[in-house]
């Protein structure tokens, strides 16, 4: 007998034949990724192996619970996969316990909040306008609504974290949780000092390493594993895996609380196809080649920052220790929105970003955020990023001179040439 799926979708059961509208949109997105330079700091290109795992039959399997303790039968194979993911993740970051089920980095953070806090408790996190993340206590986020959120900033002259000021705020407000992490901070963080401050006020320390995780795993960025009570991260960005979240700790008691917070506290059935893709990505990150890749990510970011500086652009903190490069456009009297729109028309995608103490609206901003992880995956080297800096400058100068249309067209042709020399897949 013919299956219901075959009756609905046809005997070939292909996306193209059944839903050409979705198929064409996917194909167009693939062509966009192939023909544009992806400089969004939170993006990367997952491997075919990762995507094969995520697109597997595991999407059919429900598996509430944890390996060996499921609420459904037929979980012996997904138990093996999740156990592999946990084992590899613990090895990758040198931790004892890990949860690989969170659907996102935000949900990973929520699980930590649910484990360690009660509504009304005080938390201390980096201000969104100074490079923090929504989940670090920003007013629009649940973290800013459920808890008393105190926000630390950066030094007004150097734009670096002011650890003495953070300690002063901690001593004054006695937070129950201190968050060390960022979405737009290019420099190294002093996790040891963060832990010392946390210990002085009896606070937990959460290290949100979503942006830096791959660099940490490769030894290119300081690891908080020795200092943080809990670490959270996404699995894409510099880890180059599928979109998802993880939670790690060396404390067994906290681990048990986190397990309960993820399931049944926040989520029901885990996405086993995504967990399989995470397991594959962790294996990739354990390979020697990943260390070489991560080293190049940072080197390329440094080159990009240096070359943009040569063109007269202001680089926040004067450079970078990571994959992130932040540009302050205030001296050019341009907005982030105007520049990113022009760059996109020229085939370069990045994102507008607030700079420290920005007075522009978040939908406008006075800055740009670039990242080098995706294009380094593609194979671009330092010399290529020098050219990219030149192209970015050409677009900016085109806006300043009022000649943006012709400049965008010329730059787009150069971008397409670069992309054709470095195919993604």
Curated annotation (Swiss-Prot):
The modification N6-(pyridoxal phosphate)lysine is found at residue 237. Its EC number is 2.1.2.1. NCBIfam families: PRK00011.1. It comes from the Bacteria. (6S)-5,6,7,8-tetrahydrofolate binds at residues 128, 132-134. Pfam families: SHMT (PF00464). The gene is glyA. It is found in: Cytoplasm. Its cofactor is pyridoxal 5'-phosphate. This is Serine hydroxymethyltransferase. It catalyses: (6R)-5,10-methylene-5,6,7,8-tetrahydrofolate + glycine + H2O = (6S)-5,6,7,8-tetrahydrofolate + L-serine. CDD domains: SHMT. The lineage of its organism: Bacteria, Pseudomonadati, Pseudomonadota, Alphaproteobacteria, Rickettsiales. GO terms for cellular component: cytosol. Keywords: Amino-acid biosynthesis, Cytoplasm, One-carbon metabolism, Pyridoxal phosphate, Transferase.
């Amino acid at each position: 007998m013919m299956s219901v799926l075959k009756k609905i979708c046809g005997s070939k059961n292909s996306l193209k034949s059944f839903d050409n509208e979705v198929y064409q949109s996917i194909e167009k997105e693939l062509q966009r990724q192939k023909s544009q330079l992806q400089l969004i700091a939170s993006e990367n290109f997952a491997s075919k192996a990762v995507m094969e795992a995520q697109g597997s039959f595991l999407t059919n399997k429900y598996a509430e619970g944890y390996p060996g303790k499921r609420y459904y039968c037929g979980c012996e194979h997904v138990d093996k996969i999740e156990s592999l993911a946990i084992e590899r993740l613990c090895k990758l970051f040198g931790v004892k316990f890990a949860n690989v089920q969170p659907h996102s980095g935000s949900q990973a953070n929520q699980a930590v909040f649910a484990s360690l806090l009660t509504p009304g408790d005080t938390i201390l996190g980096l201000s969104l306008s100074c490079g923090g993340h929504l989940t670090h206590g920003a007013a629009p986020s649940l973290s800013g609504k459920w808890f008393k959120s105190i926000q630390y900033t950066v030094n007004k002259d150097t734009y670096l974290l002011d650890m003495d000021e953070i300690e002063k705020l901690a001593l004054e407000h006695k937070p129950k949780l201190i968050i060390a992490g960022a979405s737009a901070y290019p420099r190294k963080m002093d996790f040891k000092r963060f832990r010392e401050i946390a210990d002085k006020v009896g606070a937990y320390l959460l290290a949100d390493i979503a942006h830096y995780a791959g660099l940490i795993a490769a030894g290119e960025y300081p690891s908080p594993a020795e200092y943080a009570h809990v670490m959270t991260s996404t699995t894409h960005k510099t880890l180059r895996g599928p979109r998802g979240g993880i939670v790690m700790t060396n404390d067994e008691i906290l681990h048990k609380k986190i397990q309960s917070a993820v399931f049944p506290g926040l989520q029901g059935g885990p996405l086993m196809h995504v967990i399989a893709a995470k397991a594959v990505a962790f294996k990739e990150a354990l390979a020697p080649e990943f260390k070489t890749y991560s080293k190049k990510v940072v080197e390329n970011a440094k080159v990009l920052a240096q070359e943009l500086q040569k063109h007269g652009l202001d680089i926040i903190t004067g450079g970078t220790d990571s994959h992130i490069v932040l540009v302050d456009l205030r001296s050019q009297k341009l907005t982030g929105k105007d520049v990113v729109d022009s760059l996109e028309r020229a085939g370069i995608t990045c994102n507008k970003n607030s700079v420290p103490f920005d007075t522009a609206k978040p939908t406008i901003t006075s800055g740009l955020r670039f990242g080098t992880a995706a294009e380094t995956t593609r194979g671009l080297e330092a010399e290529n990023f020098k050219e990219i800096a030149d192209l970015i400058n050409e677009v900016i100068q085109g806006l300043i001179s009022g000649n943006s249309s012709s400049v965008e067209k010329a730059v787009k042709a150069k971008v397409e040439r670069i992309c054709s020399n470095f195919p993604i897949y």
